């Protein structure tokens, strides 16, 4: 059995720990922070807003929040991180000062009206480019009034931005989403003293009566990162894998459940349950069968590109529907998956809210073909999840990816661990 402690701290928790520290009044400690480019953007902005950040150990920090958030004298650069931009928008909407949030070309092309509209419901003064559709965003912090909002999309980033504004508004606010998205924001903030309740799918958020409690968080491993290696195991004959110290929040393991339905053997062993469930995941290769994915999309949307690789190895036609938001990620992930598959000669087709893939079941003829002719270069579209998904496919096919370095955005250790997995599977471990 291959045993991996993937050493990829959870991206969602890392972002939130930094951003939430700014609503505390005492030093906070974040351990096992994800040192990927996205999370470092959140950390740098915290410093630009007046927080003092000190290294305490490897990948660990003491964050001393400012007494009041400082108005920066420069643009707050979110780089490629949508989480950074959207959550800081909620936080800063009620803070005194003028704040400008911008990012790289990819982030500035991603939809921002989805957060501007709920924040404006509070009375927030926030503007975006092209009639509020895109960043850069300009925020003039101002007093907020409670509101009641029903989101047309299930998005943890939209929900989190709303909650951060609601905590600073006058009066209790409510938020309803179309389906449950990841709930780390609610869990973490409640543990720090925020009054947040979920009743029949409606969140009620009361304003903070005092600063958040200081905290000492140790970040568990990211299930979205771990999933790439569950996929690697599922498509590699005779392989068995133990993934250690993984966050097992039910809103984060839907992709593992889908892979399990496809035929892979997957079991969980909970090791601790404090703030969040943490444990180990056992994965064993088994023949895969096709699947249709059209529910619980919000809980697995980040893993759909990786699941598309599993579909390639499955018997039958697999389908993804109700996943239009894939087109609004770091790349148009529907087009990215389908265009790469078509370049490889795979039968597939895209539609507005998804795609289908005709599984090969036996991939050896394609492997033989690419031993005779040079395979096409896989296009990452500078999207970390597209790059890593197709990198897993290189375990079975002799492919090259145009920019695997973009994995550093969320998973700096990915290439090293993929090589470890490859050596382990070749050695029969």
Curated annotation (Swiss-Prot):
Pathway: Metabolic intermediate biosynthesis; chorismate biosynthesis; chorismate from D-erythrose 4-phosphate and phosphoenolpyruvate: step 6/7. Its EC number is 2.5.1.19. It is found in: Cytoplasm. It catalyses: 3-phosphoshikimate + phosphoenolpyruvate = 5-O-(1-carboxyvinyl)-3-phosphoshikimate + phosphate. GO terms for cellular component: cytoplasm. 3-phosphoshikimate binds at residues 11-12, 16, 155, 157, 302, 329. One of its GO terms (biological process) is amino acid biosynthetic process. Keywords: Amino-acid biosynthesis, Aromatic amino acid biosynthesis, Cytoplasm, Transferase. GO terms for molecular function: 3-phosphoshikimate 1-carboxyvinyltransferase activity. It comes from the Bacteria. Phosphoenolpyruvate binds at residues 11, 82, 110, 157, 333, 385. The active site is at residue 302. Disulfide bonds: none annotated. It is an enzyme of class 2 (transferase). Belongs to the EPSP synthase family. Monomer. Catalyzes the transfer of the enolpyruvyl moiety of phosphoenolpyruvate (PEP) to the 5-hydroxyl of shikimate-3-phosphate (S3P) to produce enolpyruvyl shikimate-3-phosphate and inorganic phosphate. This is 3-phosphoshikimate 1-carboxyvinyltransferase. It comes from Helicobacter pylori (strain ATCC 700392 / 26695) (Campylobacter pylori).
């Amino acid at each position: 059995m291959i045993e991996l402690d993937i050493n990829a701290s959870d991206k969602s928790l890392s972002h939130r720990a930094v951003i939430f520290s700014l609503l505390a009044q005492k030093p906070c400690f974040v351990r096992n922070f994800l040192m990927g480019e996205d999370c470092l953007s959140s950390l740098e902005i915290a410093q630009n807003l007046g927080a003092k950040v000190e290294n305490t150990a490897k990948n660990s920090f003491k964050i001393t929040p400012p007494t009041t958030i400082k108005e920066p004298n420069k643009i707050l650069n979110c780089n490629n991180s949508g989480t950074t931009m959207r959550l800081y928008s909620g936080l800063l909407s009620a803070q005194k000062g003028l704040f400008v949030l911008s990012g790289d070309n990819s982030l500035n092309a991603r939809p921002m009206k989805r957060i501007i509209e709920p924040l404006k419901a509070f009375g927030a003064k926030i503007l975006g480019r092209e009639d509020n559709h895109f960043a850069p965003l300009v925020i003039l912090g101002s007093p907020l009034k409670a509101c009641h909002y029903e989101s047309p999309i299930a998005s943890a980033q939209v929900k989190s931005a709303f909650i951060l504004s609601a905590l600073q508004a006058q009066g209790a606010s409510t938020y309803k989403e179309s389906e449950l998205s990841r709930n780390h924001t609610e869990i973490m903030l409640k543990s720090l003293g925020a009054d947040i309740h979920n009743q029949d799918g409606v969140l009620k958020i009361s304003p903070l009566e005092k600063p958040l409690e200081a905290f000492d968080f140790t970040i568990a491993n990211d299930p979205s990162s771990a999933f790439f290696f569950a996929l690697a195991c599922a498509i590699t004959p005779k392989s068995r894998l133990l993934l250690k110290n993984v966050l097992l929040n039910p809103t984060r393991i839907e992709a593992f459940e889908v892979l399990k339905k496809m035929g892979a053997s997957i079991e969980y062993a909970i090791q601790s349950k404090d703030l969040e469930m943490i444990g180990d995941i056992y994965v064993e290769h088994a023949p895969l069968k096709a699947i249709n994915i059209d529910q619980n999309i919000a809980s697995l949307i980040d893993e759909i590109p990786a699941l598309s690789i599993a579909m390639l190895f499955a018997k039958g036609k697999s389908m993804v529907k109700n996943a239009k938001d894939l087109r609004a990620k770091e790349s148009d992930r529907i087009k990215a998956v389908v265009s790469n598959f078509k370049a490889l000669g795979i039968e597939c087709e895209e539609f507005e809210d998804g795609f289908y893939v005709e599984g090969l079941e036996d991939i050896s003829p394609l492997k033989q073909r690419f031993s005779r002719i040079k395979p096409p270069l896989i296009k990452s579209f500078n999207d970390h999840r597209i790059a890593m998904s197709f990198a897993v496919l290189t375990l079975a096919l002799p492919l090259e990816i145009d920019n695997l370095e973009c994995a550093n955005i969320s998973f700096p250790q990915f290439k090293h661990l993929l090589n470890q997995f490859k050596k382990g599977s070749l050695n029969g471990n």
